[in-house]
Structure formats: structure tokens, C-alpha cells
């Protein structure tokens, strides 16, 4: 259940995700702020979430442009979509803020072919803008859901199950 994030910016993000999954149904920030206030969220949580969502919107728009660059235009090498054999190197700040568990989960999703490089970069950028150091795996999963949402994509059923699964009850075998 996604509503285990009581009292945080992530609770607001989960509410937005669950109630406005069809991205075009999400109201403008001022109207959304009024709705979130009416539901009972704290002003600070709402403001943090709206700032975070604005950053998500900006990052997703920029990434969509990145993914759609025409190869005919011969863009600079750093603007091209990475090759299948390229490896993402994480600077110290990202390694420290994301932590081993989150980096492993991102790698797992990439290896499974469900997190393309353009989305991965938005996930990392938004995770770096999130509170917590390191970011918890549960918070990263919410970030990933929000990135899918911002790209107008729905994760397939198995990915969605993995993102919404509460791993705290799992027993190692």
C-alpha cells in the first residue's frame, strides 16, 4: 500500500499519483495546492511536493527532448542517446545520496529493460532533489512511479507490482 508515507512530501506525491494518474487530469499548481489543503495536507508538505513536481516537469520535458534528438542533425556527442554498451558512472555525491540499495534497484530496472537511460537520468535528478541521505528504497520507488507518470507511461504490471510492494515483510530464504 502506497499510503505508508504519512506526514511527508512523499505522502503528497502518492496522493497526486493515485488521484491524477492520467497526467492531463492534474490541475494547475495553484488549484492543486487548494485541493491538497482541502484534503488536509500540511502547507510545508504541499509546498515541498509542488516544488519537487515542478522540477519533475522540467526534467521530464528536457529528457523527452534529449531522447528525441534527430541523429541527422549530428548533435554533440554528450547530447546523443547512450549506446547499449555504455555504462553510467555515479559521482560521489550521487552514490552517497542514493546509497547502495537504491543504486542496485536502479541497475535492476535498467537490466530488466524497463528503465531507459532518459528516464533513469530523471529518476536520479529527482532523487537528488529529495530529502533523506541516503534516499530510502521506498522513497525511490515513489520517485520512479512519478517519473513514469511524468512521461505519460504506465509501468507494466510486474514493474508496478515491484514498485508498490512493501519489502519490509519479506523473509530471506
Show where each model-derived region lies.
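Positively charged, polyanion-binding regions of nucleic-acid-associated proteins
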Residues: 9-23
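A short, conserved structural fragment
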Residues: 52-64, 115-118
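Short, Lys/Arg-enriched N-terminal segments with co-localized hydrophobic residues
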Residues: 1-8
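Short acidic, hydrophobic short linear motifs in intrinsically disordered regions
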Residues: 23-37
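Basic amphipathic alpha-helical segments that dock to polyanions
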Residues: 12, 45-57, 109
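Short, amphipathic alpha-helical interaction segments positioned at domain boundaries
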Residues: 68-119, 169-173
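Short, hydrophobic/amphipathic alpha-helical patches that form generic packing surfaces
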Residues: 14-18, 107-111, 141-150
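Glycine-rich, aromatic-bearing surface loops/beta-hairpins
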Residues: 125-126, 133, 137-173
Amino acid at each position: 500500500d502506497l499510503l505508508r508515507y504519512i506526514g511527508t512530501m512523499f505522502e503528497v506525491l502518492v496522493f497526486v499519483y493515485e488521484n491524477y494518474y492520467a497526467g492531463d487530469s492534474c490541475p494547475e499548481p495553484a488549484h492543486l495546492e487548494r485541493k491538497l489543503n482541502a484534503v488536509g495536507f500540511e502547507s510545508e508538505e504541499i509546498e515541498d511536493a509542488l516544488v519537487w513536481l515542478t522540477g519533475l516537469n522540467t526534467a521530464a520535458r528536457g529528457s523527452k527532448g534529449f531522447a528525441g534528438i534527430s541523429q541527422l542533425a549530428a548533435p554533440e556527442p554528450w547530447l546523443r542517446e547512450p549506446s547499449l554498451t555504455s555504462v553510467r558512472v555515479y559521482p560521489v555525491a550521487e552514490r552517497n545520496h542514493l546509497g547502495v540499495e537504491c543504486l542496485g534497484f536502479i541497475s535492476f530496472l535498467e537490466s530488466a529493460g524497463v528503465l531507459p537511460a532518459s528516464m533513469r537520468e530523471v529518476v536520479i535528478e529527482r532523487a537528488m532533489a529529495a530529502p533523506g541521505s541516503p534516499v530510502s528504497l521506498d522513497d525511490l520507488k515513489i520517485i520512479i512511479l512519478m517519473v513514469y507518470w511524468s512521461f505519460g507511461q504506465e509501468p507494466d504490471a510486474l514493474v508496478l507490482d515491484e514498485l508498490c510492494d512493501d519489502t519490509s515483510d519479506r523473509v530471506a530464504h
